[in-house]
Amino acid sequence: MTQQVDRVSTSKPLWARYSWIGWVIVVGIAVAFPFVVDRPRFWLPNIGVRSLWLGIIAMSLVFLNRYVGLLSLAQATIAGISAYGVGYAMVTMGLGFFVAVATGIVAGTVAGFLVALIAARTKAIYFLMITLALGQVFYSYASQAIEVTNARRGLAPIKKPDLGFVNLNDITTFYFFVLALAVLCYLLCRYVAATSFGLALQGIRDSPERMAALGYRVNRYRIGAITFAAFIASIGGVVLVLDRAQVDPDVVSLGSTLDILVVAVIGGIGSLGGVFLGALVLTFLDNFAQDFTDRYQSLTGVVFIIVLLFAPAGIAGIGKQVKRVIDRRRKELSFFSVGDPQQEPPAAQSAEEAITKGKQQ
């Protein structure tokens, strides 16, 4: 007697194997964006560039949440510290562009390291509240420190340079410069997540006690992850200050912190690439909702609630959510198409017949 064995494929499902095609299309649209809009001087700075630096900063938040299990509300503050570093170096000290950029990135990364030293031993709501409190402490400092931040007036003007081989004052060139940075930040996050360091972070996220028992120093890994996320946020802060041409306490305010959180949730709190979709939604609402209502911030809140209710995984997770629904329906249909569940299988019937015959003998 031969038995037919069904082979179960252990490979990734079709949608997962070809999901990269969707992101290639998104990047293609981003590249074509400056050439298809009718008013580039409006669309590129207000929608394109702003969406990109918002996405870069939000990506640092998503990295911590996805691979470490920590939700940080200090990422906007870290980006703001980086922006202040660039502004202070260029406006107050009169340093060159590259030195100022390096100063900003170092300042933001060091700030993230200090946040990590304070908050790495906590988790969940305690980590969130500590990072929020630290952000508000710096906001108060930036609003009052006239010698360093120029208080409410901020630091200005911060001019984009003409580097010879690339002129960042040209809006199209600056857009492609920021787009390249966004792609590099995304690839860097994916690379770090795939290294032994990233795999250890995921193990710490799932079971810190077990990883500690295996000899991993959990706090050190968390400090490293928070510092790396601060480095990514600092790059976003550099782009922010070059785009705005000034830096003031508004960039580290509670409103800016909530903007980054909204971008991450709408795009997908577990998707590194989805943050750019969330940033696009937020910038569209900021620029166009004001034409229809004077309560455009309320409209942003409504969109935020709708996403939480109907797409908890964000815009980037809608495809997976639809796939799960389809798979569940297929299983339900296959269950009802098997046959009469009350009918006993032949193997069971033959076993009962054998027992009956044995008793008769």
Write out the residue ranges for each language-model feature.
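Transmembrane alpha-helices and adjacent helix-loop boundaries
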Residues: 2-361
